[in-house]
Amino acid sequence: MLKNDINTSHITIILFTAKGAPDSIIDGYDCGADDYIVKPFDTDLLLKKVKNIISTGENARKKFNFADIEHSKNIYSDFDKKFLEDCVFVIKDNLQDSSFTVEILAENINLHRKTLLRKFNALTGKSPIDLIRHTRMSKAAELIKEKYRVNEVALMVGYEDTGRFSKAFKQFHGVSPSVYIQ
């Protein structure tokens, strides 16, 4: 089933069928269909439904916030939510690794790099590197608030070069780590 495959679970499924009995429609939705259209159908109605599905997906991607991954029960299917949570888990588990890349993330969740990029973008409108950066910078802000020194924080979130870390921190938070401390 498409909705139970990590490679395709994010794809919208619309069933076009001549079976209009309520039991058939229920079965279609139980199988994971996002919409069920009985033939013959009105072309204008079909176009409206497709436009609405597309705009709903675009709106969800525009509103997407990495902090919402753990609170996104209604936005994603259970399968897609688990995929995003797995990504977050792997990133957090490798936070200190300065050589951690999207390729390593893909390998850890058993997907090809291109499939990971395509799926992640389809769900969030962003790239996995954005999630890696967000996770690192959010953790860095927490550690700075806990009074760790900037060079310690840099190492703890996967930056070997404190200057590069400070630049990335400022770009993400709008202020340098030393200003953020105050």
List each model region and its residues.
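Alpha4 helix (beta4-alpha4-beta5 surface) of REC/receiver domains from two-component response regulators
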Residues: 9, 20-35, 48, 152
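Short amphipathic alpha-helix used as the core "switch/output" element in two-component signaling
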Residues: 1-9, 131-134
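Basic/polar phosphate-binding segments, predominantly the helix-turn-helix DNA-binding elements
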Residues: 102-131, 156-176
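The C-terminal output helix
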Residues: 51-66
